[in-house]
């Protein structure tokens, strides 16, 4: 087993629950290695977001379980493809009171056929990641900072 998402994310953020840590881990540009928006050259904080987004667009299976929490992506309704920065805006189910698991389990069933939808997905992933980082930077600099 590993250290789990909460312990990893807690190195740079302060999630109160395992479910909050999973939410952060699925958010583009957030990584446990730094609070720097967009991560670093070695860790951009986009991997789980990309995998979840591919599963969402293709209506594939995606579930993540860490600590006492689980997040499961549900098949999207309708044909319109939209990526959400906040994973809780996707159709999903979640639980925060499960038996504790010290590491992290990710279950995925992905179809990676190169289709028009997949090409669109790559474009949307890039746009969504860049927009999420830009919005968080803007929000951060609006806060008063006192020393």
PLM regions with names:
Residues 8-9:
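Structured extramembrane domains adjacent to transmembrane segments
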Residues 12-19, 23-42, 53-147:
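Flexible, glycine-/charge-rich segments associated with ATP-binding catalytic modules
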């Amino acid at each position: 087993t590993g250290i789990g998402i909460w312990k990893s994310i807690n190195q740079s953020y302060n999630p109160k629950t395992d479910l909050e840590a999973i939410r952060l881990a699925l958010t583009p540009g957030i990584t446990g290695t730094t609070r720097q928006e967009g991560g670093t050259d070695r860790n951009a904080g986009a991997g789980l977001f990309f995998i979840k987004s591919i599963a969402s667009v293709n209506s594939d299976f995606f579930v993540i379980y860490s600590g006492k929490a689980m997040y499961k992506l549900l098949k999207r309704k309708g044909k319109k493809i939209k990526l959400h920065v906040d994973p809780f805006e996707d159709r999903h189910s979640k639980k925060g009171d499960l038996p504790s698991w010290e590491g992290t389990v990710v279950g995925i069933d992905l179809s990676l056929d190169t289709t028009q939808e997949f090409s669109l997905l790559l474009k949307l992933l890039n746009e969504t990641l860049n927009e999420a980082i830009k919005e968080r930077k803007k929000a951060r600099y609006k806060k008063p900072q006192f020393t």
